[in-house]
Amino acid sequence: YNALGWYTEAPPDSERRHVREHTPRHERVLQQTFRQFADHPQDWRDFLDWFQQMPLFIDAGRFRLVHACWDDSLIGALKADYPDGRIDRDFVVASAVPGSFANRVFERLLRGTDLRLPQGLTLTSEEGFTRAYFRTKFWEDDPQTYGDVVFQPDALPDNVASLPLTPTDKGRLLQYGLDEPMLFVGHYWRRGRPAPLRPNLACLDYSAVMYGKLVAYRLDDELQIDPNKFVWVEVERPEAPQ
């Protein structure tokens, strides 16, 4: 989406030129990709065409796939026009309008749920981005504090983690139930040994781009995620030129 939005013109009434505004921050996210494709323009065009064909979700009945968060309500509505999750250019264009259905779909499925940090606080991530929000779990059964729901590499300060969630905070959270199909997500930059988050939920993003692990799961006929079926390779940091 970051790449498609960078090249897709926004609607005339959206007060921006492109769906993904050409800010230094947005450019930084794509910088390495641009650099690696600089001498391969046709390959890059082919990749952009491929990105446009990729589904935003896969619902195979027994298991599901989504980048960041499964939202039954949004996905159900999306299926009405895009049953297989493959959206078109018009949908990307529509996402330039904040609060539009397309915008809410991309924000939720590709970015997940989040909460604003209390008391005007901000956090600076390992990548150098300063944020006023933090990523949250979308499966916690009965969370009471900020620490119960935080789900990101950068920990909350202890004095923030212990603060109670307000009713408004709780209303912004989702709950993916234990009775739902197995769900595999990425997005969250995990560390350590790959393992399920719950019997029906696993994250396969273990920070490969930051020299972590490139992770997969060997799926057979099981109905719950088997901790012994994660497979991975360690991503080696390249040696510096002599």
Question: What is the meaning of each model-derived region?
Answer:
Residues 1-115:
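Active-site neighborhood of divalent metal-dependent phosphoester bond hydrolases
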Residues 12, 119, 228, 239-242:
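Generic low-complexity segments that are intrinsically disordered, proline-rich and/or Lys/Arg-biased
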Residues 43-46, 54, 170-172, 190, ...:
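Intrinsically disordered, low-complexity boundary segments flanking structured domains
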Residues 79-88, 174-226:
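Conserved beta-sheet core of the metallophosphoesterase superfamily
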Residues 99-192:
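Alpha/beta-hydrolase fold catalytic core
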Residues 214, 223-240:
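Regulatory N- and C-terminal appendages and interdomain linkers associated
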